């Protein structure tokens, strides 16, 4: 369920804004989105896992706050990220 270090490094390399970037909003949102998608698949098969569902809701809230921050700070970066991740259909 947890995201592997290898996958996390792959996401960081894909979404980084500069060479030593690991904590920009884009990277954080990409990592959260991947974790949310994995947890969503888990919850489809384990419908009564309420403990994990609460973790999912917390991650969705955190991602939402980061997206709001990015939208207020730089709309073009926000739109690029939304398109790249396939959010907001």
From Swiss-Prot:
Q: Which GO terms describe its cellular component?
A: cytosolic small ribosomal subunit
Question: Basic and acidic residues bias located where?
Answer: 1-21
**What superkingdom heads the lineage?**
Bacteria
Q: In the UniProt record, does the keyword Membrane occur?
A: no
Query: Keyword S-adenosyl-L-methionine, does the record have it?
Result: no
Region entry Disordered, spans: 1-24
Give the molecular function GO annotations.
rRNA binding; structural constituent of ribosome
Oligomeric form and interacting partners: Part of the 30S ribosomal subunit. Forms a bridge to the 50S subunit in the 70S ribosome, contacting the 23S rRNA.
Q: Which family does it belong to?
A: Belongs to the universal ribosomal protein uS15 family.
For this entry, the protein name equals Small ribosomal subunit protein uS15
Species in which this protein is naturally found? Bacillus subtilis (strain 168)
Q: Species lineage, top-down? A: Bacteria, Bacillati, Bacillota, Bacilli, Bacillales
